C-alpha cells in the first residue's frame, strides 16, 4: 500500500488538465525548423512542476506533493504565471537560477528572465494560491539581439555562484561569451572573446561562416566546480575570491579553459588557455562535429564531450606537470600558467536511430543521421548524466569511476594499466526513449526533461513528448549509489556472512550483472503524426526485426550465459561444500583426540606439580640446615640478632619500670596502713571528698592494670 500511495501522483500527473490544455492548443504552435529541435520547457522546484506554454507565453505550475496526498487528487487545479513583458522569440529552454528565485527563458534570438513570485499561505503556494499571477520579466541583451540580426544565441547558463548577484552567461555565434547582471541587463558586466583569430575587431559575417565551416567557433561551454584560487598564483587573485573554471568547446573538438571570477574588477577577461592536450592522441581529434560539453562535479573532474553523430567522450581532467606546459599551449599560454590535460578514458556511441538487422545478402550500412545533443546533470548521482536530442533520450552511468579514483590515489604511472581499467568495465548506456526509430521517420523531439530529486516522491524521470504527453520513467537503480546501511545492520563477529566475501574485489552478483549488461535496449518508442494512423508495414517489420534481434542477443543469449555461469558456480560451490564437510569430519576427530590428549597432559601436570612441590620443600630444608652450619652469620641473621638485642633492652627498661611501680605501690600501702588507725577516729570525709578520692584511686588502678596488661602481652609475644 505504501508503494501505491507513492505512485498516486504519477497517475494523477499523466491525466492533469495542464497537458489536456496544451494538447488542445498544439495546432496553434508555429510550424518551422524549431519543431525539429529538442526543447526543455519544464523544471521542478520545491515539489512544484513548471511547464511553459509557447502559445500563451505563460508558465503552468502544480504541486506534486498535493497530488500525492491522501484522498482524491485534484487534477484540475493549477496556477498560471503570466509574463508582464512576454518574450518576442520562441522559447527553447528554461533554466532555474542557483538561488531558485529566477527562471531564464532561452531562445535562439534572445533571453528573458522571469522573477518567481513569493509564497505564503497554508499550502505555501504562490501568492497564497491565486489562479493567475503577474510576474516581472527582465529582457537580457535585448538591444544587442535587435541590432545584430545575424547573431544567434548558442547557449545560456546561469553563473554557478549562489552567494553573488545572479548573472546570466550567454554564448553567441560571434564567438563571444557575455556575463549579464540582472540589475543592468542591457550591458554585459564581463566580456570574454573566444575567437581563435588574433584580431577580432574586423570579423565579418563571411569570416565567421568560414570559421564555422572549419570548426573554429565555440559551440558550447560549461562551468566546473569551485576552483582553489591560491593555486592560481599566475592570475594574481586574492585567496578569498570565488573562482570557477570555464570549459569552452569548439566545433572541431578542441577544448579551451579560462578561470572566471566576477569579484575581480576587470571588465574584460583575457584569452582562454588551450587547446587542452588530449591523450591518447587521435587523428580526427576525437570528432569534428562537437556540439555539447558537460563537467561532472566529481573529483577528479570528468568532462563529457558530445558530437552530433552520437559519440560521447569521457575525459578525465588531469593537472598539468611542469614539462607538459609547453608546445600545445604555447600560443595560448598566459605567463606561467599551466593548462590541465584531458585523458580520454572512454568513447561511447549513442544509438540515435535504431540499428536495423541486415539480411543475409545485405550489407550493414552506417546511419548518417546526426542531430545536436543536449547534456543534463543528474541531481541524485554525480556519476550519471542524461542526453536529450531529436531522436529521444539516453541515460549514461559511469560505473567505473570508483575504480578510477582508487587508481589515481595509488600513484601508479603505468598507462597500460589505465587502459586495461578502461577496457575492463564500460559505462552503462540506457536508451530510455526513442522518438525517431528510423532515419526517414518524422521528427518528434521531446519538449521537456527533468529528474525529480525529491526523495519523498521517488526518483523519477519526467519526459514531455512532442504531443505534450507526460511520461514518468524510473531511473536505472544500478547506477545510483546505494544508501549507507544502518548502524544496527552492520554485521558483527557472529554474522552468518562468509568471510570469503570480503576477499573478493567483485562479488558474484556483480559478475552476473556484468554478464547481463546490455549494449543496446528496446526503448519506449514514440512516432510523430496521427496516433490513429498505423505505420507502414515495412517500417513495422523493420522495427519488429530489430526488437527481436535485441531480445535474442541482449536478453536471451546473455540470460543463457548467466544461467551457465550460475550452474558452474553451483557445481563449484557443491564441490567446495563436500570438501568442507570432509574437512569438518576430520576436524571433529582431531578435536576428540586433542581433548583426550589434553586430559592426559592435565593428569601428568598435576602429578608433576605435586612432585615439584615435594622436591622444593626438601631443597628448602637442606638449604636451611646448610645455612645453620655456616660459621658466619648471614645478613638476615644479623638483622634478627640486632632486633632481639633491641627487644631485650626494651624488656630491661620495662622491668625497671615495673619494679619502680611496685616500690611506689608498697610505699603507698605502708603509708596508708600507718595513718589509717589514728586518723580514723578524728578524720571525717564528706561525700564530695570521698567521691574525689575514689575517682583518683580508680584512675591509678586502671593505669596500673593497663601497665600490667602491657607487660603480660610483651612476655607472651617473646615467650618469656
From Swiss-Prot:
It is found in: Nucleus, Nuclear pore complex. Widely expressed. Higher levels of expression are detected in highly proliferative frontal regions of the embryo, e.g. brain, eye and anterior trunk. Changing residue 414 to Y: Does not rescue developmental defects in sa2206 mutants. GO terms for molecular function: structural constituent of nuclear pore. GO terms for cellular component: nuclear pore. GO terms for biological process: mRNA export from nucleus; protein import into nucleus; ribosomal large subunit export from nucleus; ribosomal small subunit export from nucleus. It comes from the Eukaryota. Keywords: Coiled coil, mRNA transport, Nuclear pore complex, Nucleus, Protein transport, Translocation, Transport. It holds the Pfam family Nup88. Residues 584-611 form a coiled coil. PANTHER family: NUCLEAR PORE COMPLEX PROTEIN NUP88, NUCLEOPORIN NUP84-RELATED. Component of the nuclear pore complex. This is Nucleoporin 88.
Amino acid at each position: 500500500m505504501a508503494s501505491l500511495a507513492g505512485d498516486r501522483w504519477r497517475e494523477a500527473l499523466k491525466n492533469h488538465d495542464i497537458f489536456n490544455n496544451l494538447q488542445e492548443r498544439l495546432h496553434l504552435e508555429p510550424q518551422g525548423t524549431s519543431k525539429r529541435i529538442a526543447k526543455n520547457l519544464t523544471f521542478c522546484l520545491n515539489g512544484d512542476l513548471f511547464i511553459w506554454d509557447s502559445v500563451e507565453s505563460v508558465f503552468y505550475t502544480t504541486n506534486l506533493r498535493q497530488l500525492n496526498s491522501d484522498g482524491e487528487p485534484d487534477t484540475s487545479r493549477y496556477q498560471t504565471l503570466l509574463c508582464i513583458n512576454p518574450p518576442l522569440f520562441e522559447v527553447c529552454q528554461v533554466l532555474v537560477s542557483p538561488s531558485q528565485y529566477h527562471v531564464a527563458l532561452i531562445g535562439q534570438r534572445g533571453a528573458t528572465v522571469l522573477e518567481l513570485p513569493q509564497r505564503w499561505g497554508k499550502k505555501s503556494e504562490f501568492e497564497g494560491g491565486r489562479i493567475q499571477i503577474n510576474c516581472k520579466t527582465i529582457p537580457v541583451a535585448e538591444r544587442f539581439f535587435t541590432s545584430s540580426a545575424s547573431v544567434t544565441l548558442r547557449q545560456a547558463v546561469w553563473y554557478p555562484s549562489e552567494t553573488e548577484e545572479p548573472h546570466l552567461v550567454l554564448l553567441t555565434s560571434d564567438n563571444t561569451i557575455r556575463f549579464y547582471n540582472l540589475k543592468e541587463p542591457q550591458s554585459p558586466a564581463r566580456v570574454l572573446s573566444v575567437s581563435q583569430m588574433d584580431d577580432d575587431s574586423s570579423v565579418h559575417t563571411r569570416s565567421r561562416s568560414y570559421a564555422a565551416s572549419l570548426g573554429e567557433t565555440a559551440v558550447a561551454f560549461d562551468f566546473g566546480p569551485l576552483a582553489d584560487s591560491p593555486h592560481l598564483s599566475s592570475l594574481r587573485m586574492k585567496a578569498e575570491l570565488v573562482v570557477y573554471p570555464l570549459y569552452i568547446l569548439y566545433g572541431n573538438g578542441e577544448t579551451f579553459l579560462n578561470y572566471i571570477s566576477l569579484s575581480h574588477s576587470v571588465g574584460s577577461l583575457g584569452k582562454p588557455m588551450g587547446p587542452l592536450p588530449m591523450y591518447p592522441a587521435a587523428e580526427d581529434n576525437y570528432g569534428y562535429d562537437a556540439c555539447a560539453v558537460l563537467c561532472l562535479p566529481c573529483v577528479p573532474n570528468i568532462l563529457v564531450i558530445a558530437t552530433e553523430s552520437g559519440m560521447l567522450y569521457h575525459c578525465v581532467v588531469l593537472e598539468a606537470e611542469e614539462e607538459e606546459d609547453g608546445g600545445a599551449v604555447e600560443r595560448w599560454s598566459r605567463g606561467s600558467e599551466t593548462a590541465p590535460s584531458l585523458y580520454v578514458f572512454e568513447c561511447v556511441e549513442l544509438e540515435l536511430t535504431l540499428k536495423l538487422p541486415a539480411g543475409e545478402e545485405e550489407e550493414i550500412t552506417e546511419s548518417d543521421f546526426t542531430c545536436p545533443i543536449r547534456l543534463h546533470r543528474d541531481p541524485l548521482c554525480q556519476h550519471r548524466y542524461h542526453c536529450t536530442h531529436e531522436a529521444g533520450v539516453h541515460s549514461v552511468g559511469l560505473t567505473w569511476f570508483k575504480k578510477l579514483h582508487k587508481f589515481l590515489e595509488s600513484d601508479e604511472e603505468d598507462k597500460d594499466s589505465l587502459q586495461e581499467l578502461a577496457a575492463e568495465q564500460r559505462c552503462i548506456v540506457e536508451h530510455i526513449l526513442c522518438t525517431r526509430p528510423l532515419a526517414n521517420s518524422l521528427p518528434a523531439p521531446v519538449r521537456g526533461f527533468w529528474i525529480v530529486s525529491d526523495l519523498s516522491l521517488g526518483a523519477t524521470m519526467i519526459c514531455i513528448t512532442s504531443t505534450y504527453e507526460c511520461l514518468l520513467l524510473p531511473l536505472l537503480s544500478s547506477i545510483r549509489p546505494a544508501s549507507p546501511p544502518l548502524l544496527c545492520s552492520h554485521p558483527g563477529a557472529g554474522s552468518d556472512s562468509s568471510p570469503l566475501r570480503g576477499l573478493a574485489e567483485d562479488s558474484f552478483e556483480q559478475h552476473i550483472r556484468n554478464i547481463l549488461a546490455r549494449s543496446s535496449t528496446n526503448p519506449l518508442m514514440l512516432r510523430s503524426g496521427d496516433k490513429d494512423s498505423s505505420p507502414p508495414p515495412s517500417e513495422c517489420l523493420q522495427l519488429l526485426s530489430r526488437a527481436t534481434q535485441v531480445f535474442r542477443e541482449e536478453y536471451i543469449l546473455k540470460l543463457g550465459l548467466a544461467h551457465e555461469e550460475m550452474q558452474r558456480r553451483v557445481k563449484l560451490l557443491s564441490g567446495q561444500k563436500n570438501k568442507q564437510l570432509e574437512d569438518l569430519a576430520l576436524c571433529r576427530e582431531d578435536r576428540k583426540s586433542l581433548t583426550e590428549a589434553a586430559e592426559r597432559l592435565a593428569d601428568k601436570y598435576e602429578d608433576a606439580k605435586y612432585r615439584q612441590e615435594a622436591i622444593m620443600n626438601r631443597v628448602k630444608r637442606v638449604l636451611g640446615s646448610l645455612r645453620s652450619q655456616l660459621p658466619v652469620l648471614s645478613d638476615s641473621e644479623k638483622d634478627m640478632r640486632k632486633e632481639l638485642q633491641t627487644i631485650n633492652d626494651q624488656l630491661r627498661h620495662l622491668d625497671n619500670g615495673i619494679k619502680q611501680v611496685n616500690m611506689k605501690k608498697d610505699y603507698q600501702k605502708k603509708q596508708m596502713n600507718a595513718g589509717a588507725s589514728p586518723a580514723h577516729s578524728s578524720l571525717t570525709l564528706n561525700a564530695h571528698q570521698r567521691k574525689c578520692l575514689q575517682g583518683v584511686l580508680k584512675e591509678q588502678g586502671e593505669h596500673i592494670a593497663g601497665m600490667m596488661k602491657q607487660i603480660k602481652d610483651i612476655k607472651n609475644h617473646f615467650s618469656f
